[in-house]
């Protein structure tokens, strides 16, 4: 039996507000900013983004988040690297993905 939290292991498949969960990727030179949602996701003790991950052609980077923090992460890219996708994990609604 899956717990609600585990139901979101396939990205973007949980019935929840996409505008608050799908990562938004912004690339400026070698810095990548990933914001969770086009509408800011709540960061409450009972409902928050646990982590944000950036997948690149050369690997992955991840930032752990806590309740009360901004649901944003900034990652640095090597000159030869490119963004593939960003992921965010909501403690209630599971895994969300955006491709670049």
Give the ranges of each region predicted by the language model.
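Short, aromatic- and glycine-rich surface loops/edge beta-strands on solvent-exposed regions
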Residues: 82-92
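Exposed beta-strand and adjacent loop surfaces of beta-rich binding modules
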Residues: 31, 49-51, 83
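Short amphipathic, basic-aromatic surface patches that mediate peripheral association
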Residues: 36-44
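Short acidic/polar inter-strand loop motif in beta-rich domains
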Residues: 91-99
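Solvent-exposed serine/threonine-rich low-complexity stretches and specific carbohydrate-binding patches
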Residues: 58-68
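Transition segment at domain starts
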Residues: 1-31
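Extended low-complexity, serine/threonine- and proline-enriched intrinsically disordered segments
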Residues: 48-58
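Short strand-edge motifs at loop-to-beta-strand transitions and within beta-strands
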Residues: 71-75
């Amino acid at each position: 039996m899956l717990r609600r939290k585990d139901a979101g292991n396939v990205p973007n498949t949980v019935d929840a507000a996409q505008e608050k969960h799908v990562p938004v990727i912004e690339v400026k030179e070698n810095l990548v900013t990933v914001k969770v949602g086009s509408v800011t996701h709540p960061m409450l003790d009972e409902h928050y983004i646990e982590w944000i991950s950036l997948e690149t052609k050369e690997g992955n980077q991840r930032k752990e988040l806590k309740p009360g923090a901004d649901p944003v992460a900034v990652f640095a890219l090597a000159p030869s690297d490119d963004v593939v996708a960003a992921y965010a994990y909501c403690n209630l609604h599971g895994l969300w993905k955006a491709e670049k």
